[in-house]
Amino acid sequence: MMRIALFLLTNLAVMVVFGLVLSLTGIQSSSVQGLMIMALLFGFGGSFVSLLMSKWMALRSVGGEVIEQPRNERERWLVNTVATQARQAGIAMPQVAIYHAPDINAFATGARRDASLVAVSTGLLQNMSPDEAEAVIAHEISHIANGDMVTMTLIQGVVNTFVIFISRILAQLAAGFMGGNRDDGEESNGNPLIYFAVATVLELVFGILASIITMWFSRHREFHADAGSAKLVGREKMIAALQRLKTSYEPQEATSMMAFCINGKSKSLSELFMTHPPLDKRIEALRTGEYLK
């Protein structure tokens, strides 16, 4: 969840900055083809900037510290576990980081399979058994081995392209309609302030709506990462880890879902914006072996 949230926030910020620069400098495409090229460049540009910054952003956001040399038995176990699983998964040894937080959490990120990072919280190491922690680490290793961050970047790039393209087409129409035609009979792009305001608002709104697509992909890949963990360390260990998460977080999640859904009943709507499937669904998928085939 951490890596996806940071990726999307950074990506959205880059898109907004690009849009501001274009609008303030008066750079507008005069043709649909030109606008599409611009949307492709900036849409994928935002995604790849987010990907390249992902390790730095993730570590900075949680105050994580990369383990260069293990200082105690716990760090030694963590590094050895990551090394063993990386070797089993056929990827290069990721950087290993630890950060101080009471919650049970871990994430993996990085621009390439062979230049990745796995970070775990102190809460995970303190509150999970070695088998459960091993399963969570294997889950993150599976994300790296599956190339999920790169695939997410490509999907987000396509989504960004359409968000920018459609937003600016509609902004040009709105600016032209509200700005009227020029007296000399030449075609006008309309009021630039209207264009700037409409384009910015539409990019934000469409960006949030488009996140439904990326959230769906994220949930889908979580099932595959769970299956990858089961293959590396065993199905029962991964199920035990998810059950531990369920007992640790379910009461808090119920409260937050009520706030989000207003009446606390419309869980299906809230799931559209979740990066992870409900824990019960993940446990059931492991038990049935749906993604282990």
From Swiss-Prot:
Superkingdom of the organism of origin: Bacteria
Keyword Zinc: yes
GO function terms (MF aspect): metalloendopeptidase activity; zinc ion binding
GO cellular component, one term: plasma membrane
Note describing how the cofactor binds: Binds 1 zinc ion per subunit.
GO annotation, biological process: proteolysis
Keywords: Cell inner membrane, Cell membrane, Hydrolase, Membrane, Metal-binding, Metalloprotease, Protease, Transmembrane, Transmembrane helix, Zinc
Family label: Belongs to the peptidase M48B family.
NCBIfam families attached to this UniProt entry: PRK05457.1
Protein name as annotated: Protease HtpX
Lineage, opening ranks: Bacteria, Pseudomonadati, Pseudomonadota, Gammaproteobacteria, Enterobacterales
Gene: htpX
